[in-house]
């Protein structure tokens, strides 16, 4: 409704459809007034953006998975070359928290990670979105469910992402945006 101008009190917006790491980067460069971001990325631009109260994504049972084309023990992950969907994604943060000794990390757009694993370009990859449901069809095996690991370790839902807005829009404009998102 917001994007299509259906809400009369809402400001006009221009839709930008990109993967989450691209959106994180655009926020880092302050290119957008309102943007969906990874919670992990928010710390990189919190001086310029504030997190809105609406539109956040906290999940249970829907976190990133690490998968491989061969059986890998989770404890051996730090010796592998691992694809991540961007350095500022929550998925990247979770795999680094799980395997802090992991050093061989390759950034690959999320929709190409399974192909990179199948082609042997990486040993494993952190997958997000619908990939977590389709990876068995690609002959891949789960190494670890990072969402399940996070939830069992912390007892908290996975902090996936939220909507951020530029602070320099001013209080009135930010309240208007917040109200439109709630509607």
Please identify what each model-predicted range represents:
Residues 1-57, 68, 75-81:
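N-terminal hydrophobic or amphipathic helices and topogenic motifs
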Residues 1-9, 17, 62-123, 130:
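Bilobed "Venus flytrap"/periplasmic-binding protein-like clamshell domains
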Residues 7-8, 44-46, 95, 134-138:
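Short loop/helix-cap segments at secondary-structure boundaries that form the rim of catalytic
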Residues 12-14, 50, 103-106, 141-142:
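Conserved beta-strand segments of alpha/beta enzyme cores
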Residues 27, 36, 107, 125-127:
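A structural signal for short, well-ordered beta-strand segments and their strand-loop junctions
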Residues 27, 95, 177:
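A residue-level signal for conserved active-site and pocket-lining positions in enzyme catalytic cores
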Residues 51-74, 151-168:
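Hydrophobic/proline-rich hinge and linker segments of small-molecule sensing/allosteric domains
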Residues 109-183:
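Pocket-lining segment of extracytoplasmic ligand-binding domains
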């Amino acid at each position: 409704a917001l994007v299509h101008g259906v809400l009369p009190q809402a400001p006009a917006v221009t839709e930008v459809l990109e993967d989450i790491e691209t959106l994180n980067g655009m926020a880092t460069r302050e290119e957008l007034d309102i943007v969906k971001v990874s919670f992990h990325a928010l710390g990189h631009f919190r001086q310029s953006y504030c997190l809105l109260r609406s539109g956040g994504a906290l999940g249970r049972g829907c976190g990133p998975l690490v998968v491989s084309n061969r059986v890998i023990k989770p404890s051996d992950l730090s010796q592998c070359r691992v694809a991540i969907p961007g350095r500022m994604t929550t998925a990247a943060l979770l795999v680094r928290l799980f395997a802090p000794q992991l050093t061989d990390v390759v950034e690959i757009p999320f929709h190409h990670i399974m192909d990179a694993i199948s082609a042997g370009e990486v040993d494993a990859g952190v997958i997000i979105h619908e990939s977590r449901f389709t990876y068995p069809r690609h002959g891949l095996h789960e190494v670890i469910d990072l969402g399940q690991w996070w939830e069992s370790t912390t007892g908290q839902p996975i902090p996936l992402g939220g909507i951020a807005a530029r602070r320099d829009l001013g209080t009135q404009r930010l309240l208007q945006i917040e109200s439109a998102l709630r509607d």
